[in-house]
């Protein structure tokens, strides 16, 4: 079976709360790091989430 091109990543909150989301991304279409605005339930507002490596 062929290995998939999608890689698992972690989106970590820039608010410093320690909250994170996990998702996948296609490395061929998006080689740069992602920066997405999502809801942080700890801070109770929308903040930027930066891509980090999933350990």
Curated annotation (Swiss-Prot):
Belongs to the bacterial ribosomal protein bL33 family. HAMAP family: Ribosomal_bL33. InterPro entries: Ribosomal_bL33 (IPR001705), Ribosomal_bL33_sf (IPR038584), Ribosomal_zn-bd (IPR011332). It comes from Bordetella avium (strain 197N). The keyword Ribosomal protein applies. PANTHER family: 54S RIBOSOMAL PROTEIN L39, MITOCHONDRIAL, LARGE RIBOSOMAL SUBUNIT PROTEIN BL33M. This is Large ribosomal subunit protein bL33. One of its GO terms (cellular component) is cytosolic large ribosomal subunit. NCBIfam families: PRK00595.1, rpmG_bact. The keyword Metal-binding does not apply. One of its GO terms (biological process) is translation. Keywords: Ribonucleoprotein, Ribosomal protein. One of its GO terms (molecular function) is structural constituent of ribosome. It comes from the Bacteria.
